[in-house]
């Protein structure tokens, strides 16, 4: 099947309400995962995992506040194309069991994958969401997740490639 205009019309649609619900769950599971993981990781990266839990809590709070806004009820019913990144993003709601003593490299690899999935999803949503507070939120989160991913990549390189793991 060629990927022309016909293919684009076959893509399933979703509402911004559904997007908001999935994103809220994504951030909640990330927060819980990192909070549970923090005492199990090495001291070398514990601060990173604790920061990730705090950041995910902030993102969760932002989504919950958006969901409560009366002025967004109509906007939340807007249909948009489901982003290509949606499946990968949704899959991240299911978190792995990294055991009681996960190694730093495994933790950082997982965190990088999650941040990358979030960055792609929020960027795609930014491009498809009408101007307004929800679009502004997706723009903010796309930038935040990009920043987190870059910071994690630098730390990963420092720890893994300097013999820290």
Predicted regions located by residue number:
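Non-heme di-metal
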Residues: 1-165
